[in-house]
Amino acid sequence: MTLTKQVEQALLDSQEDLRNALAFAARTEKPYVSNHIADMLLRIDSLMEVSDIFEKILED
């Protein structure tokens, strides 16, 4: 099942906000903070990619 447009847009918005947070964290915070923010970005990206892959598999 693919993500709804509303959820997909919310995730894209979240990624944008997290990228901004990562940029600030890289300059001012301890490295583990940046690491966790980057991990959140990766998880959102992975969720969106896997959702697309599952949809293609289910179509066949």
Show where each model-derived region lies.
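N-terminal acidic leader/helix
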Residues: 1-28, 32, 44, 49-58
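Short, charged, amphipathic alpha-helical segments
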Residues: 31-39
